[in-house]
Amino acid sequence: MGVALTRLAQWTAAGYETGTLEITPLNESILNEITKFVESFSYKYPQEAKFVFVEPLEWKTYLEPSAFELGYVVSATTAESEETGKDGQPLLFLSVPYIKVRSFGQLSQLLSIATDSKLQEAQACIEANRDPVVKILGPDYNEMKEDPTRLTLLDTIIKDKETYMKRKVAILLKQLDLHLLNHSLKYISLEISLNPGTFKKDIELLKRFSGKGEQTVLESIEYTSDYEFSNGCRAPPWRQIQGEICYVLVKPHDMETLCLTCSTEGVFLNGGKTEEEGEINYERKGEIYKDLVTCLKDKSPVFSENMSKHEIRFTEEQQKDNQIFEKPKTEDGHSSVAGSEKSKIEKISFGKSPMTKRLEPSLNWRVTVDYKDHKSSIKDSQEEKQGKLEKSSSVSVAPSRAQSHRKGGEKVEETVSESSSESEEDEEPPDHRQEANADLPSEYWQIQKLVKYLKGGNQTATVIALCSMRDFNLAQETCQLAIRDVGGLEVLINLLDTDEVKCKIGSLKILKEISHNPQIRRNIVDLGGLPIMVNILDSPHKSLKCLSAETIANVAKFKRARRAVRQHGGITKLVALLDCGQNSTEPTQPSLYETRDVEVARCGALALWSCSKSHSNKEAIRKAGGIPLLARLLKTSHENMLIPVVGTLQECASEENYRAAIKAERIIENLVKNLNSENEQLQEHCAMAIYQCAEDEETRDLVRLHGGLKPLASLLNNTDNKERLAAVTGAIWKCSISKENVIKFREYKAIETLVGLLTDQPEEVLVNVVGALGECCQEYENRVLVRKCGGIQPLVNLLVGINQALLVNVTKAVGACAVEPESMAIIDRLDGVRLLWSLLKNPHPDVKASAAWALCPCIENAKDAGEMVRSFVGGLELVVNLLKSDNKEVLASVCAAITNIAKDQENLAVITDHGVVPLLSKLANTNNDKLRRHLAEAISRCCMWGRNRVAFGEHKAVAPLVRYLKSNDTNVHRATAQALYQLSEDADNCITMHENGAVKLLLDMVGSPDQDLQEAAAGCISNIRRLALATEKARYN
């Protein structure tokens, strides 16, 4: 931090000792980085945050004592922290307006309190404490010469804890210093763009658009000096040392003449020309702008307005001038202007910073590209697009090549069925382009200038431009779109098609970062980037393989990209990366060799994880032999490897073929083992994989046998990570389908914990929690446990939701609890039955069916069920009308509900009036055994009112019922025999049964071990026999 502040921070003319920080982009960047570092210090380094500074940092603050709340003793003019050092002094003391801070923990807390004024506080602190490192560590603490990235063995066994802690803080400060130096390079490297040629172009252009008319942008613009030095500068030599290039007098339409300084740092307003001597006051009077046009737009509203009218024409003129002025060779004038800055940079000691090495241009270039070669390259690529020339390799290639490559490589898209799990970015989002007049940050324009070097520069410029571009925050959308808008994506993709490894690596590193943006992803696919990346997977260079696979992982977030990867053979190559250790030819040290292999496999797994959201890709992974390799990688101890591996398995486990293979490869054992990991993300994906696989009974048993139920139950206690909680509760839900697992969960107190999760949780968690309770409550002991833990009320409260999956599960859980009379009383008191009944109107068939099933135990166990059902206005009519549904599950559940409703004679009369008999009869011709059983039971019950027996015969329900006796389901036999017994009370029905062969089938069932079936079959045969005897008797009489 000390080196960065002394050598890079820009101070006012008063100098480093007494001046203040200037308002410049570089200073603002340094302040932002320091603020981020201090803000995150408390939670990143909790032990180091407690270290007490040798001397307090003291400055004049903008904060008031009232801003400090918890953990502080506050009065009208003072505030002090309750936290104190060994000497009993507070670690933070504010006496308006001065503040003293003695630890990073308190500094971090202060910045969180400051919110909007945190940068002001940071600036005031740095200006008041010119060498903060000395105050923090003491004047005798020498600068470290060791590697700052690791502690030595001596450090770990040192007895003096205070010295040890000071050492760790010193390392962190050294790392911050290096970070600030590296981070500042992007501002220094971009000064290369501001040279005499740049300003000369801009001034000449503005002159063309200036004059006396109202539509002109300016009245006049001219240099203060007509003399031009050989290097292109017009500033005096002693000012050129400061980076100044020239001075211009600008007369806008709406204000007095402005005197502007054009320098390598930008454009700013100076003190103007003195009237007597005509000398220029060089002192800066305002902020620095990135160029002349931006400065004038800010100063003059009329200029801004008129400029917007001429924007297109002005841009065209600029592009014409670029072809004249822009040359890849560095001008001599430029080097002399930037000389002082270069010497300033060279003085900075970067130690062994990786940035230094990264900025060194390669000397081993195969081809030299100058301006003429570049023009011919464009011409070649245009001919190539028409198929007239063969593809050639070059470092700097034209943007049009990306398009020709794409068109040549495209195949006819096959029609594929994509997985239902593909919910991510399947819709094409609108392509947002930056507006011409948008108020864009300086980074946007700086990146665009770098892209120009990529397009037309020589090899050195290409490498430096790639390195400089990476120093920007490429996670920002502005930076990503800046690369795209100026044609940088095409260039980056074409650099992948060269033979230069460094160019490929630099390009892939940038593409990897910016491909997190959905628009950029789609642009990469449109430009044919994926086939090239897939080909790079065959490269012998492991670093290239890694970067290519990681970029594919980012891009393959939508259907078209996943399909493209598969169509170009990417799945097979990615699967091969999982086994790359056996195919490697790079001679390296054993430890490094193993590490690189692990990294290659990890990146391959990441890409497969993204691709595995497609059904066709899942099948391709399986056919390529991916499952055994994933199973082998699952045994590794590298957590960063395990996460994508388990993530891929989790996606693929939705397919039945995969679940069988997962069992065969004994993957469940390793999934269970990794549930005990400390990594929350790994726990989440393991639980999710178990959730997918536990549809199978054998898998549920394996989870129990390998001890997976206990860690699942223990993970329920940590509710902070909602994604992990959803995965864990999902795994518990599916495992609870097996009764043996439910017993174990009861032992581990999981049911009580699940009840506690019924409130204040997101729907993703609630669906699984309620599903698990629904399965657990099939057992009597668990129903009692849920009631005693107060689980009934939150379950009933969830009946008013709108989430389909949640409603299906909660109705099942409420229905399971309703089996117990005491729980049923609570449900009735909370108006739960009415809520269930209202769900019969839900548009989703699954919700209707689940609600109808839940009503069955409610009606069966209610104290006055008949009266309760009749109290629901229109409720019986609603139930009867549901018999018109096309959904078999809805029909079966409604028939079951009618069976219970019809136990009350008054209710039976009402549903008969609503036409239940013809609707039930209409359903008789079904082959679904579940529906057959409950339909037969409903018919049996409905026969007990009036002439319903006769009506069923008239509606031809008897003959289909006889066929039910041929089913293989004993439950269907019993229900059918009971229905036929009731129907056989009518003579015409007996005749129909006899004609359809019922007697023979019923005789076979009289010998059944099921007593109810025996009695019903015998009773039916008895009625048929009595009718036959009566007929015989009548004939002879």
Swiss-Prot record:
GO biological process, one term: outer dynein arm assembly
Quaternary structure, from the entry: Component of the outer dynein arm-docking complex along with ODAD1, ODAD3, and ODAD4. Interacts with CFAP61.
Name the record gives this protein: Outer dynein arm-docking complex subunit 2
Tissue expression notes: Highly expressed in testis. In males, also detected at lower levels in lung, brain, liver and muscle. In females, detected in ovary.
Subcellular location: Cytoplasm, Cytoskeleton, Cilium axoneme; Cytoplasm, Cytoskeleton, Cilium basal body
A single cellular component GO annotation: ciliary base
Entry superkingdom: Eukaryota
Keywords linked to the UniProt accession: Cell projection, Cilium, Cilium biogenesis/degradation, Cytoplasm, Cytoskeleton, Methylation, Repeat
UniProt organism field: Mus musculus (Mouse)
